Amino acid sequence: MTKSNIKGKLSFKSVSEQSAEMKILKNLQSRKIPDNELLENLGMFLSSKNLSRILCLDFLYKLQIKINGNIFDFGTRWGQNASLFSTLRGIYEPFNRHKRVFAFDTFSGFNKINKKDGKSRLMKVGNLKTSQDYPKFLQNHLDLIDSLNPISHIKKIWSIKEMHLKF
């Protein structure tokens, strides 16, 4: 596998894999599926890697069902894990009003790099930042996802900006 860049984005995927993913993205963007049926058919656009990742999160969620407490997603970036955990909570613990999901991130990328981080091309100041208004978008989106779960009148998911943790 070679390290490669498409449009300046860091990727460790092969060129052929990136090309196939771009074609799938174009298929999604130019789909013949009506808007009102798109969400029910998103599986059409999932690769085995993406589905494996979702199934892994499903496995991890099932491991903690009998454990009291909340779910914390540190470094949430785009919020996919938090969104999936909220959805899984709605599936496996629909009436557990005490299980909450917290998504933490600075949303500004790496503010500094330590030599312990290594010399990967990923390790650059500002890398992994989101768009400027993303934290607000993410919270609104997570609220929408949660609104589709049972007992949606009780807030069960939060996106928290400016995570300052020292280890």
Label the model's feature ranges:
Residues 13-16, 61, 79, 86:
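A broadly tuned "polar low-complexity/structure-edge" signature
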Residues 50-57, 82:
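Short alpha-helical patches at coil-to-helix transitions and adjacent helical residues
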Residues 1-23:
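N-terminal auxiliary segments of SAM/dcSAM-dependent transferases
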Residues 21-48, 65, 70-167:
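S-adenosylmethionine/decaboxylated-SAM
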Residues 54-67:
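Conserved alpha-helix/loop element of class I SAM-dependent methyltransferases that forms part
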